[in-house]
Amino acid sequence: YDRRRQRQMCIRDSNNTYRANDALSSMFMGALRSTSSALKIGLGGAVFFFVETHFSLPRWDSSSILTWIIAFIAYDFFYYWFHRISHERQIFWASHVAHHQSEDYNLSTALRQTGTGFFLTWVFYIPLFIIGVPSYVFVSVASINLIYQFWVHTEHVPKLGWFELFFVSPSNHRVHHAQNEEYIDKNLSLIHI
């Protein structure tokens, strides 16, 4: 593949971090994932409703800030375990590997998601419904986490000092995406380090 042609195909920015073919591939995968999200919402939603209705402890008070803080931290905890297993077990890795296949690291990489993840992800969040997290608190917290996940996929944000000691940042998420042996399967959390 001609490097000059590849440079011409870059979407211009100061670091040439967006090659058109890679960015378009990531965006196309994100669009495909969006269509499978309807299945995830339907399947997961039905199971969550059933668990919330039949097996849940008393529902937490959604007007309490403590409910939201605990739900936010608990969501990140269960995401960590989902993400860790996605790196350690082949059936999960087969679904997650697409996200790590981009040769570039930019915002479009966040969109590079598989369409098969819905088969596996929702299972990890069942405990939240068992302990009494209201479904609309869960949906809100999941949405905030999803938005947060987007911005950490960039090379354009420098190190953020003390922030990186507590929260996932673009810098330490770049380590997660690195292919160096010592960095593989590191920094698996979504929000908290």
Residue spans for each PLM region:
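Membrane-helix interface/capping segments
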Residues: S14, G44-V51, I85-F92
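Membrane-interface helix-loop junction between the first two transmembrane segments
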Residues: R12-L24
